[in-house]
Amino acid sequence: MKTANCPSCGAMLTFRSAVSILTVCNYCKSTLIRHDLALENVGKMAELLPDPSPIQIGAEGIYRKTRFTVVGRIQLRYGQGLWNEWHVLFENQRSGWLGETLGNYTITSLIQPPEPLPAFPELRAGQNLTLRGRAFQITNIETAHCIAGEGELPIRVGAGYDAPVVDLQATSNVFATLDYSEAPPLVFIGEQVRFDDLKLTRLREALPAGWEPDAGIKAQSFQCPGCGSALTVRAKGYTETLACGACGSIIDITDANFRILSKFKTQVTHEPIIPLGAHGTLENAEYETISYLRRAATVEDVDYEWSEYLLLNRTQGFRWLVEYNGHWSLVQTTTEPAQVTGYGAQGRAFHQGRNYQHFQTAKAKISYVLGEFYWRVKVGERCEISDYIDPPRQLSLERTSKEIIWSLANYVEPDLIKAAFRLEQSLPVRSGVAPNQPSPYTAQRPKFRRLLWLFLGLLIIGQIATLALSSDQRVHQQTFVFDAAAKDKALTSEPFAVSGRDSNLFIRAETNLDNNWIYLDLALIERETGASYAISREINYYQGVDEGEKWSEGDAGDEAALSDIPAGIYYLSVEGELPPSSPTVTCTFTLFRDVPSWINFFLALLGLLIAPLLLSWRARAFEGARWAESDYGPSGKGEPEEDND
């Protein structure tokens, strides 16, 4: 650490980092270039634009178990709004950068260019580059404009200089920036980080005057230069443009005179379900609704339109709340690109350990805007959107000529939206199935599976017990001879005893039929009470030789069952009917008591399978309704590949 006095005002200056070559005096705002111990005053530094960043010089944090201190900042403006690069000094004296853009944070360090890089005009969004043997994808190409700097910095900066920059992403949240303001380009590599993971302390306690501490949003009112309507800016420092709902003017908020950038005309005025300025708590963070837009896409001459609400939290940044046909999703951009494989129905996107299936690709345009936006929004602005789903998540890729943006959406139940924003009016009724709507039947499968195994186990145990307890006792056997010419066709068996609990009684008949039939009327009669259990059976058996091949039809034997027969003394009454010219037929009847049966087991098993089969059918119907809206529905390009996972 070195100290020196400001040559302009005499204030004490401290250089904490050995690589710092520039400092801005905190008192007189002189820009001072360091030449060993001498300081050269190169003029006044421009004023920083006020913003709601919670970070300030002197803030401390931890990254990968190493402490760091914020010692300087460069503030830039690019197409998406304000961008802060905080110069940080680690306790091991290593220098790095904490990037802050729209609530997204990165930690990067300057490295030597690993290989010659393409010229800036040659680069395109979506193009792949290899840095240090790792594959990166270009996600954004911008020319940023420096607003001002503060604190100590390792490079010379000043208001107004242009910085052509290229952002690149790789897997595992690895992030890189190419700065073409110098030759050869400066290369910064690091990773995306979460604000909470940095464990930052000594943050800005007092926000600029008028900012609300809870939401971190300042409300500023002015009159629309197009129609005079009262307008409110809730996110100054983030907001680039504001759309007036009264006249359709899109206003440049960064301009002191609130210059009108464009106007749009619409015959339909949309009223947001969630009012602008409404606060709501989602995923344990409080957000304020600052804008609303409508997007539209036309697929096979069918128009689809949906609503998007822009939410802001001071530390968590921006989120999008998307509503389509009464379905809601909370969306966050991600700096980690997905690995895309296959095309069409076989298209897959792998991201952070999850496998997403391609759902649809369409060209969308902004059809209506209201409120404030962090970029220069314009009605008619177009992009191509590809959606991949793994309910309840949806991974989306938005592509323009200058950038590609990956975002992750989580399905949110409408009741949670209504409660989060304390809405009194009813929300739109859900229609159809959303791409990332979780199937209620899929969620029930584990429960049904557990119950199925439980009842199947009980059923098997019950059947085993039935088999073990059944006596399968032969109680009587007797042979009868039936004559077609006999006048008295009724025959009666000798009495026999049936003992034990109420149970079944099987009657088995074995005959000497050969190319013949017999019709039997059987009656099991209890001798004391006269209780009768009747049953009729027909037995037939035919055989022969046809063109040298033997054939047969029917069976010479038969079996019938009577259920719930109580104990007692019984006899069997049998009456047989034969063809008029039939020879005599011998029939032996054998009666078995308490015979183990499988019929009830299989009927119960069939009953058990009805519920899961019904569940599976309803789950397939639900998925069919989901995919009917995709590129692979009835009017789409084909059927999606079935996922058996």
Residue ranges and their predicted role:
Residues 517-554:
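Surface-exposed beta-strand/loop patches in noncatalytic accessory domains
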Residues 86, 309, 546-547, 559-569, ...:
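Low-complexity, Ser/Thr/Pro-rich intrinsically disordered linker/stalk segments at domain junctions
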Residues 491, 495-497, 545-566:
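Beta-sandwich interaction modules
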Residues 74, 293, 511-513, 524-526, ...:
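A mature extracytoplasmic/lumenal domain signature
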Residues 498-515, 520, 562, 567-577, ...:
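Hydrophobic beta-strand segments within beta-rich accessory/binding domains
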